[in-house]
């Protein structure tokens, strides 16, 4: 009888240790940064997004609502450039232009993970990696050839996350960003074909392809039955 009780206690102790070792701490926030490359589509480049690649750096902050849903604030700094000599389309009077610019962007985006993202806790069917889709709104400020402009942007795209460790995340994200302005490439290239631009018509686009590293913090309420 005593041996049976001792065996049960030993099994319970081992099970408790196993659960403690495999349990996943749940965190609310994720912060980090990344580097990558940029592309541009507009009056100085109408076809190949990567014909004049630039560079970008970014900082990110996520609120992780659940293993599937997150809100992300991103701050980007990057360079863009273009040259009409590379284009097959000819501008009026065979004019040639080139530009380079530095932009600053602040965006707020929604993320949806295709899998329950996380580690441990098999009953929640958590996966160590997940692809995701994302979209939102932003504001971009830039300086091109002495001209400083600003415009709203609509960033959207896809990405993938991988948990290197319990709280450390590696990510790769591609975003296309529609700028509600035709002056991202400067005033000289605004409406070169005399087709007047509107708020959403005949405006410039740019992209970012960014490799990110981030760290989770701020544990959720361990005794609550809901996500705070």
Task: Give the residues covered by each predicted segment.
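Residues that define the transmembrane beta-barrel architecture of outer-membrane proteins
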Residues: 27, 51-55, 102-106, 129, ...
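Bacterial Sec-dependent N-terminal signal peptides
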Residues: 1-27
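Short glycine/proline- and aromatic-enriched beta-strand/turn motifs that initiate or cap beta-hairpins
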Residues: 23-62, 208-220
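Gram-negative (and chloroplast) outer-membrane scaffold detector with strong preference
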Residues: 67-145, 210, 217
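Predominantly the C-terminal beta-signal and adjacent terminal strand-loop region
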Residues: 165-228
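Outer-membrane beta-barrel strand-turn architecture
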Residues: 25, 63-67, 114-116, 162-166, ...
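Outer-membrane beta-barrel translocator domains and adjoining extracellular loop/strand segments
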Residues: 43-48, 84-90, 121-124, 145-150, ...
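Residues on the lipid-exposed face of transmembrane beta-strands in outer-membrane beta-barrel proteins
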Residues: 33-37, 59-63, 108-112, 135-139, ...
């Amino acid at each position: 009888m005593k041996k049976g009780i001792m065996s049960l206690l030993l099994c319970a102790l081992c099970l408790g240790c196993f659960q403690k070792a495999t349990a996943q701490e749940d965190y609310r926030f994720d912060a980090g940064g990344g580097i990558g490359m940029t592309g541009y589509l507009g009056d100085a480049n109408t076809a190949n997004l990567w014909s004049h690649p630039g560079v970008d750096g970014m900082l990110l902050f996520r609120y992780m609502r659940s293993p599937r849903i997150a809100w992300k604030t991103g701050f980007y700094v990057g360079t863009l450039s273009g040259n009409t000599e590379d284009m097959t389309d000819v501008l009026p009077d065979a004019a040639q232009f080139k530009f380079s610019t530095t932009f600053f962007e602040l965006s707020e985006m929604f993320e949806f993970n295709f899998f329950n993202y996380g580690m441990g806790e098999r009953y929640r069917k958590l996966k160590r990696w997940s692809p995701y889709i994302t979209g939102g709104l932003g504001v971009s400020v830039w300086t091109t050839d002495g001209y400083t402009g600003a415009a709203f942007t609509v960033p959207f795209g896809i990405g993938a996350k991988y948990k290197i460790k319990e709280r450390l995340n590696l990510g790769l994200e591609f975003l296309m960003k529609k700028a509600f302005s035709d002056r991202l490439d400067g005033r000289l290239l605004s409406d070169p074909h005399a087709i007047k631009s509107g708020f959403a018509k005949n405006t410039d686009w740019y992209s970012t392809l960014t490799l990110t590293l981030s760290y989770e913090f701020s544990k959720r309420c361990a005794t609550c039955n809901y996500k705070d």
